[in-house]
Amino acid sequence: MPAAPKQRKIAIVGSRSVGKSSLTVRFVEHHFVESYYPTIENTFSRIIKYNGQDFATEIVDTAGQDEYSILNSKHFIGIHGYIIVYSVASRQSFDMVRVIRDKILNHLGADHVPLVVVGNKSDLKSEQRQVSLDEGRQLGEEFQCAFTEASARLDYNVTKAFDLMIGEIEKSQNPSQPAGGSKCILM
């Protein structure tokens, strides 16, 4: 008899218009939403298979944050990990990653939480890019967390972002188990 799925809850956070909902809908419903409708908050569910184990995952797609917005207490209760999304075409959204991470750490009173930083919209033309791949990697290294670029439009690295999140959660829950040799996974 297969083991029961482990329950995991992930919050998707980031500035407005970075593609948080697009990443989530692409991952859960396997399609890309062309039009933009600001999200208030949605919750999605999907089973993620990671290292042979099923994870019943609840994904909380939050409204966009800015430095003055307050993350709701619902964004902390029972959350196992955070995917912080920025747009590679927005320097401001990249700069907000640090602010959002600090808000999460301060609210939880923690030095480290399971995080994945995702640079979304990697399909945009190079002249639209304001944040380099190396800058994203360096931020992941600084935060000691996983990092990847992704494109919800092209379905590039979307599943990888969620797999990395489960990996970061599992690493934090089972610190004695090696997770590929280092604290940070760069893709």
From Swiss-Prot:
Lineage: Eukaryota, Fungi, Dikarya, Ascomycota, Pezizomycotina
PTMs per UniProt: Farnesylation is important for efficiently activating mTORC1-mediated signaling.
Gene: rhbA
BP terms from Gene Ontology: asexual sporulation resulting in formation of a cellular spore; cellular response to nitrogen starvation; negative regulation of asexual sporulation resulting in formation of a cellular spore; small GTPase-mediated signal transduction
Description of how activity is regulated: Alternates between an inactive form bound to GDP and an active form bound to GTP.
Designated name of the protein: Small monomeric GTPase RhbA
Gene Ontology MF: a single term: GTPase activity
Enzyme class: hydrolase
Listed EC numbers: 3.6.5.-
Keywords from the UniProt entry: Cell membrane, GTP-binding, Hydrolase, Lipoprotein, Magnesium, Membrane, Metal-binding, Methylation, Nucleotide-binding, Prenylation, Virulence
Site feature Important for autoinhibition of GTPase activity, where: 36
Keyword hit for Lipoprotein: yes
NCBIfam families: small_GTP (TIGR00231)
